[in-house]
Amino acid sequence: YASRGLGDVYKRQMLWMVIICLIGFAVCFMGLQNGIEKISKVMMSALLIIMVILAVHSVMMEGAGEGIRFYLIPDFQKIKEAGVGNVVFAALSQSFFTLSIGIGAMLIFGSYLDKSRSLTGEAVSITVLDTFVALTAGFIIIPACFSYGIQPDAGPSLIFITLPNIFAKMSGGALWGSLFFLFLTFAAVSTIIAVFENLIVFNMELFGWNRKKSVVVCAVLVVILSIPCVLGFNVLSGFQPFGDGSNIMDLEDFIVSNNFLPLGSLGYLLFCTRKNGWGWDNFIAEVNAGTGMKFPKCLKNYVAYGIPAIIIVIYLKGYYDKFAGLGTAALAGWMIVALVLLGFVFYCATAKKKVKQ
């Protein structure tokens, strides 16, 4: 019976993974205006409304004040213990992930913007809204944890273990729990729509496919490649790519967070600022076209040299932190891999080529 129950769990997880993927690709199949734009407007508006309602309810709970203080007042001793550099590194790494910097999502949706509005103003608006959503999510979770005397965790255990326990104890918990996970669903679907559209448009432009063919091919590949993620905590739990306690999701996170995001960002920067690529003059003319906030031209050296240097430090430190505990030989080997990938990005972004304007 136990094995049958576990088998049913795997099947349900697989089913919901396929359903969510199909929903995302169905929206993208309808196109920008009829699909992504219409559905995202409704979904994001509902997401923000639900977030505000949940946050107000959470901060008004008995004992929530302690959680608010924990959330908003920095503990400099903890920062000192963790190391200022590590804290800054973690914050910068999170910015890559939360803003989808480095995987092309911003590039794709930026190409859809009307020329009458400057890209700089839109970028600032996106950053402000993203920060607001992140802060509001904290007001939903942290005060509720302290109200019920539960120390807030991090990662999946916070969402799928700690919070359900809180909702189970809460008056009207079924309602608030349903609203919270509806909010998470909207957030997840909006994210996969952005990622899927990026994949679809990439194939349309690179191979000349129409949208229908690109959607079908990408949908099949994404579903197949997502299967190991679904099975990583159960059937394939014995696969531990980084030693005891690691799983397939850790490998996926390493590939994306430690490689794709920083290296993708670096590639974009080098391409936009180097003469062999798009070039600074073309870049600044594009981002400052239209009305709204303008990107300061005086920041050329910072964008061309300062930010790439910061990204390289983040990238190499990520490898060091990941593999430092494996011994000197293993660390040296992985750092060589990191440098080879870094060199490949520099070559691709700066090699002399004719760029279509």
Task: Specify the residue positions occupied by each region the protein language model found.
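Single conserved hydrophobic/aromatic residue that forms the stacking wall/gate
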Residues: Y1-Y10
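Hydrophobic alpha-helical segments and their helix-loop junctions in multi-pass secondary transporters
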Residues: S3, L48-P74, P143-S147, P228-F233, ...
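Hydrophobic alpha-helical transmembrane segments of multi-pass membrane proteins
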Residues: I19-A26, F89-S100, L179-S190, V256, ...
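Membrane-water interface regions at transmembrane-helix termini and the short interhelical loops
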Residues: I19-V42, I108-S116, I192, V201-G208, ...
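Hydrophobic core of alpha-helical transmembrane segments in multi-pass integral membrane proteins
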Residues: L22-F25, V52, M335-A349
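Transmembrane helix-loop boundary segments of multi-pass membrane transporters
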Residues: G35-V42, G121, P152-T162, L175-F186, ...
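Membrane-embedded translocation segments of transport machinery
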Residues: E37, K41-V189, I193, F207, ...
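C-terminal membrane-solvent junction of multi-pass transporters and transport-like membrane proteins
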Residues: F207-A219, I255-Y315, L326-L331, K356-Q357
